[in-house]
Amino acid sequence: VTLTGDDQLGHANLNLNGATVTATAGIILDDAGTGLATVNFTGTAAQTVNGTINATSTTDEGTVNVLASANVVTFANNIGATATNILAVNIGNATLAGNAVFSGNVEAATITLGHESSVASAAYSADFNGNVVGDVVMDTGNAITETATATFAGNVTGDITLDDNVAAIDATATFDGTTAQTVLGTVAATTDTDGALRVTNTAGVTFQGVVGSSSTGIGSLGIASDS
């Protein structure tokens, strides 16, 4: 499946809501000028996606949206790669929650979980079982019961930003791998006391960048015994 946006013809959008989506040769996203290529996963029940999703070049092309509300979308293969980096992966938006499991690696310029303008009492989640390359933003909306939780089992190359839009600590990043992990990038709070950082990996996690700052400290830091 190839989606190609075009300056003259406009955007290319594909909505997929079947229980099983199989793209034997993968899904290719091609942004051309102002024409954007976007694939939306909108499963009405739990959804499994078989096949890679890539851009046509290294210039950050294409958008992947997970908009299936409480239904979990599981991606069996890699999304993006060094030479075919995706522009954006969005899990949920302002009106629909998103919950995703990524079995392979994910490479995108930006990976966004949740939405700052959401007013729904929704739970946004992402389970990354491979390596992640790209900047990750975890953003809860204006409802106090809204949560954005991400678990990382592999290495992360990019910055992680935790943003609680209400007083509760609702944006939580957990590192739960079974082998040693490395985070190449910062872990930052948008405002002071935003977010929670958890380490449950008993093999250890090395953070090579700054975690929080004197003016915008992380709201909660938890390290499990033997981690």
Language model: regions and residue ranges:
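Short, solvent-exposed S/T- and G/P-enriched segments that are highly enriched in secreted/extracellular
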Residues: 133-136, 157-159
